[in-house]
Amino acid sequence: MAEIKHATDTNFEELVLKAERPVVVDFWAAWCGPCKMVAPEMEKLAAKYEGAIDIVKVDVDANPGLSRAFNIMSIPTIAFFKPGAQPQGVVGFRPLEQLEQQFGLAEFEVASPVSESPESVTAD
């Protein structure tokens, strides 16, 4: 299973701002119903783009400094940080397909390995 990292006020810069690859950040809280709907979408993103995009979650209640720094007024807020570009964000639940379209993630998609069928494998 692909790894979803958890950022704090102290490690956010390292995990997100200094990351060498793009990062999708889920700003959430345990009491937030729509945030619970976003969690499976983040898992799908992590699996689909493993090795190409990092997924990071930020608990806004435990990390108020990040909430202030990024002006998070509503949750869930999902932000896309691409090295060398301004972050983009959306508020509220979005299914995987909408997140991919909103943030232009198709360019980062990792090709699935092609498995050979038993008929196409020849023995020497």
Give the residues covered by each predicted segment:
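Hydrophobic beta-strand anchors of alpha/beta hydrolase catalytic cores
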Residues: 24-25, 55, 78
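Short pre-active-site segment immediately N-terminal to redox-active cysteine/selenocysteine motifs
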Residues: 20-21, 28-31, 74
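Short acidic DE-rich linear segments
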Residues: 113-124
